[in-house]
Amino acid sequence: MKFTRTLVLASTFLLATVATSQAQEVKRDTKKRGEVVLKPITIISHGKDNIEATGGTVLTYKDIEKLQPANVSELFSRQSSIAVSGGGGPSKRIHILGMEQSNLAVSVDGVPQTATSWHHTGSNVIDPAFLKRVEVEAGAAAADSGFGAAAGAIRYETVNALDLLEPGKTFGARIIGSYGTNGRGFSGSTAAYGLKDGFDWLLMLHGTSGHNYKNGDGTEILGTEPAARNILGKAGYEFDGNRIDIGYERSRDKADRLIKMNMGLPGDTEYPLEVARDSVNIKYTRTDATDMWDPEVQFYYNRNDYWRNDYQNRTNGNMILKEDLYGGKLQNTFTIDYGKITAGIDFGKHDYNTDNYGHNDRRYRKFNTQQVGAFTQGRFEFDNGFSLSTGARYDYSRFADWNDEVFSDSGASVNGTLSYKFNEHIEVFAGASRTWLGYVLGDYGYVHARNNAFYTDPTFSPGRARNYKAGVNFGGADWSAGITLFDTRIAGLPNYDSQKLGNDPEEYRSRGFTLNARYIWNYTTIGATFTKAKVTAGDDPVLPNSGSFMPIGDMATLFIDQEIPDYNMKVGATLAWAGRISDEAATAANFYDQPAYTVVNAYAEWNPPAVKNMTLRVGVENLFNENYYERTSFAPSQKRGGIDPVWAPGRTFTFQTAFKF
């Protein structure tokens, strides 16, 4: 079977090469095509951080269009440093270098997002249908990335009318419909957008309806049916050099799910579950910014709800979790001879509410955290080949618990990344950060199963993190490559034991290296990534229990995209590989070894010449029907009579038609 897969993949690359040579009677100038020109290798470019140059990940609108991701697993399928667990939408957990995304400062359109509320649910994520760009800044994050950037930052950006409008047009619309096998069912996305007299607007709807999928062995995986109902609305207005943007995002997922969505227990039964998210923000900027006046003012409100109110009469059962997060940011960017300096303040309040339905002796709990911070970050490019990104922030944090006990403290964070460019082809860099995290509450959903005597330890203290990275980048006009060494350490995280909330005594650490390479030849793009990470708690490897820190071992991806302009076609394929994981600590904790797996996805896209505004696409995920579970899923275990992972989908075909007017 391994030989067959290798043969098929090799054939794919060979066919792509042949197609390239046959289809290119006329050479093109790639510099005229923004999506195929590689950026110069440098950590600072035009006063902005180049995330990819320091081992991070950037997905552009063109990248997302190629992938047409139905979920976040497919969104990050070409990134070996990012692992997404399986299951239905609300169960997917995103880990970067083995660390769940709650350990990073996550934002959508600049708005901070809440952390994962419960250890049996997924990460809070944005609908990929709305995205135009994703930046994953792993490790030492900039001071203006936001509060609590322990292991870096993730920035999601959604589309607006100006992104989708054709040149010279003032109105447009887009309709995308698809049908998928293996339970994927129907998916539909509709968008309308326009521009008139300085006012631009967009309204986008996306919904999915399907059934539980089956794994590679043909077993139905309960609680995995697609059930998204999402809305994105945006409006912007420009006048006299001013611009105001207003955005609203609404996300709903209501279906029968497993109680513990990240693991399979004997005798599992589905129960109704609804997960909801609403986000509103308003932002002010200048379109005629000067070197000394380039302001940004933003205010936001987020609400996250989790309803599980029809389960059995146990403390492990019914609960409602509600979170309200609101705050803002005021900053200005100054342009000087060698770069830019951004300075400002940000603030936020996070309210938590839990309802246990009276199945223990403390039904309701209310508690909150507050934060106020000041920050500055400079990004400089010097004539002697050096570039520098450095900054600092100082934050005040306050935590008021469910017993009205109040904790408060303040602390400083610093970061710096220095690079030297020997020539146009080689650059070396090194960076470090020390981050003060304030009071970290983490998976606060634990309190739903705690009684009235549960309290906060008087010594509960803020968390802290350290990051180190170093590497070298190579590149030319049509190729790039790089290696990044990383070491992230996080301490002072919460521990919800049976009696109290306190600090986890362990320091969690992820260290290793990443490799990346990309080559562009005429209409062909080939890329590869490799990640090797060792994730530990204290001196011991972390357990594969779908927690905030997970063992990922060795992971790699290989991908190709091929344009065939003579036939208005695009084809591509992605291979994802994960190595076997076996360690004594996991075995002693009754976990089985995690086998290696190889998964191949592929797609073909065609624009009929007679209907230029229509695109037909067919994609296949898990081409060889591999029976596997993603590296950050709960690994199989002998505990509780036997725990199964949430297996990934088997072979799935998706047929899509898109119209743009």
Curated annotation (Swiss-Prot):
SUPFAM superfamilies named in the record: Porins (SSF56935)
Pfam families assigned to the protein according to its UniProt record, in alphabetical order: Plug (PF07715), TonB_dep_Rec_b-barrel (PF00593)
Entry-linked InterPro entries: Plug_dom, Plug_dom_sf, TonB-dep_rcpt-like, TonB-dep_rcpt_b-brl, TonB_rcpt_b-brl_sf
Signals that turn on the gene: Induced in absence of iron.
Membrane topology recorded in Swiss-Prot or TrEMBL: Multi-pass membrane protein
Subcellular location(s) per record: Cell outer membrane
Keyword terms of this UniProt record: Cell outer membrane, Membrane, Receptor, Signal, TonB box, Transmembrane, Transmembrane beta strand, Transport
A GO MF label: siderophore uptake transmembrane transporter activity
Domain TBDR beta-barrel residues, every copy: 170-661
PANTHER family with a match to the protein in the record: HEME_HEMOPEXIN UTILIZATION PROTEIN C, TONB-DEPENDENT OUTER MEMBRANE RECEPTOR
Protein name in the entry: Heme transporter BhuA
Gene from which this protein is expressed: bhuA
